[in-house]
Amino acid sequence: MSPNSKGVEILSIGTELLLGNIINTNAQWISEQLSQLGLNHFRQSTVGDNCDRIVKVIQEISKRSNLLITTGGLGPTPDDLTTEAIAKSFNVNLFERPHLWDEIKQKLPNSKLQDDSSSLRKQCLFPKNAQIINNPRGTAPGMIWEPIEGFTILTFPGVPSEMKTMWEETACDFIKTKFSDNYSFFSNTLKFAGIGESSVAEKINDLLNLKNPTVAPYANLGEVKLRITARAKNHLEAKNIIQPVKEKLKKDFSKFIFGENDDTLPSVLIRELTERNQTIVFAESCTGGLLSSSLTSISGSSKVFKGSVVSYSNELKNSLLNISEEKLTKYGAVSEEVCESMAINAKEKLGADWAIAISGIAGPKGGSQDKPVGLVYISISGPNNHITNIKKLFNSTRNRVEIQTLSVNVCLNSLRLILLSNSK
């Protein structure tokens, strides 16, 4: 867009979005597409299925933006009001496009459509000069329309698969031709584990003020992301802008950065073990198979992951992992001593290079003064009788799933660090 442009806005229409019944993935996806096109996307709005409210929002947006992209409200039901509201916003009439009705009838050949099927025919109504965006996956077309000079509206249905196809086949080229200035945004995301967002932010304070590239931290459960974004004409130019910042971060946070972009802790660990031609097994208690699932969700995990024992009860710890009743009684299932034995015995019984065992109290019940909710023991048994024991005490205000997920992340990252240390 030109330097004098006002920017782009996204308007998501649907009461179900306001009620939280569905997640608005459309706005996220469109935002990514706009960034790739280098467009200034400043605001997103959501409004329910109420014509007057939709009209008010559209009229407000038309005063401050060049391009409005709407999703939702194009279907045949009474609460699909987007096109009607757009027409009302600019005091114009809607006209039927007969060829669209013919297309709808062809898409629904087995239904008993009548020429007076007004609920479906409303999808054929558009302002006089609007350009139709064909919907090959559904019955609700969209439109490209410039109701006033300098302001364009693109409408899409709320079904993600339909919206994406219409965007890729029609809308993207239109937006690129009319609004893009040949600059695009390119991003590279570094992923951190074993360090909190505040600690990262404190150490990169100088980088947070950069204009091109920009550096922005984001936190997920047990993980921090740093997104480095450059505005450039092509990937090579962007890479040259991003690279110095990326190299500085890798130097300053060498052991904490585990990957980039689509990397995950499970995928990185699988890659590291594959490169070493090593295998791994698990002995899980408090995570109940979540650790195993984190690996098996990744394609190619069978090269390194042999299996696991989910020994939730003391009986199974005894019968499957040979943890003596005396040890269980003396130290308790949630203890370093028992967890270490679980790892050693799992490695021996299941025949792998590495074994990770985990035992803890995920809550919300079951804790005590000596062993509170959030207490987790992790043991890693490796080649040459290598043993690493880890004790973590997660905040007891976290819920059960959060404690389990954080525990899995610690397991994976701890072995990653061991492998990294061994390779030096």
Swiss-Prot record:
Domain of life: Bacteria
Gene3D superfamilies reported for this sequence: 3.30.70.2860, CinA-like (3.90.950.20), MoaB/Mog-like domain (3.40.980.10)
InterPro entries xrefs: CinA, CinA-like_C, CinA_C, CinA_KH, Competence-induced_CinA, MoaB/Mog-like_dom_sf, MoaB/Mog_dom
UniProt xrefs under CDD domains: cinA
UniProt-listed NCBIfam families: cinA_nterm, molyb_syn, PncC_domain, PRK00549.1
HAMAP family, per database record: CinA_B
Sequence similarity: Belongs to the CinA family.
Protein name: CinA-like protein
Species, as recorded: Prochlorococcus marinus (strain AS9601)
